[in-house]
């Protein structure tokens, strides 16, 4: 499996984890985002700053994954929500957050100077996600968005139905 061509870059500075998000925050990068945040949270990290300076677009899957980290899991009362901060989100991204009723979940930062930390690829090898991984994370993300606000149900009802059906279909060789 090839290594991701445009990875999310990571810098750990004090208690904060900075994630430099590439130009497009989409369903493919959502798998990587989930792996990075999950791994670092298990290591005790709770504050994540997403540098969106270079990010021009964000899709609903990426946003649903992010929202899943902000809200504690209902199945585990001891789970804690993470502090996710969005740095330099452009108007297109903030409009998406507002339209999906999740803008209140995040802290916003605006910095005129670029982030000068030394960013590196994450230490664990992350490969291009499989179709199954993308389907699973996309379904989970869209269900999360529907749970957050009932206004999202009609927006994602067909998508979640399709993803459920895709998940049941055995892969063809």
Please provide the spans of the model-predicted regions.
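Short hydrophobic/aromatic-rich motifs at helix boundaries and adjacent loops
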Residues: 7-10, 40-42, 65, 113-115
